[in-house]
Design a protein with these regions (language model features):
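Active-site-proximal alpha-helix that buttresses catalytic centers in soluble enzyme cores
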Residues: 1-145
Length: 145
């Protein structure tokens, strides 16, 4: 405890603030701005594929918009079916299962629960692997110029 209060809490906030300033954008957190862009892209692709309107919302396990807040927003919008896709491609008890736990903690308080689908992992999905390969190729193409 002396180490925490004596050294860590006196030095870490200043170092962390400097690191955050380096990656923060005009939109704020890069995680949030990237998540919003992914959400918009997924909404567009799903609406094309399903030929109709689809609600796609971003939720964060340890941040805002939170999982409970987002689930309530979908419920209030009249969602009858929810598909939850964690952005962790591989399953892990500390990440994917933790997000599932947060979702379950919220839903167990509801009187009526919509139809629900949970995508547990997709690291070995051919479409995901191809997308990673295309992204890697684009990145290395830009780096080698």
């Amino acid at each position: 405890r002396a180490l925490l209060h004596g050294i860590i809490l006196r030095t870490r906030p200043k170092k962390s603030a400097a690191s955050y300033r380096e990656v923060w954008t005009d939109e704020g957190s890069p995680l949030l701005s990237t998540g919003k862009a992914q959400t918009a892209g997924m909404k567009s692709r799903l609406e094309q594929r399903l030929a109709g309107p689809v609600e796609v919302e971003l939720a964060m396990r340890y941040g805002n918009p939170s999982i409970p807040e987002t689930l309530r927003k979908l419920r209030d919008a009249g969602a009858e079916r929810i598909v939850m896709l964690p952005l962790f491609p591989q399953y892990s008890g500390t990440t994917t299962a933790s997000a599932f736990d947060a979702m379950a903690d919220e839903l167990k308080q509801w009187r009526w629960i919509p139809e629900f689908r949970w995508i547990q992992q997709y690291a070995d999905d051919p479409g995901y692997i191809d997308a990673c390969e295309r992204g890697r190729n684009n990145l290395t193409r830009n780096v080698t110029r």
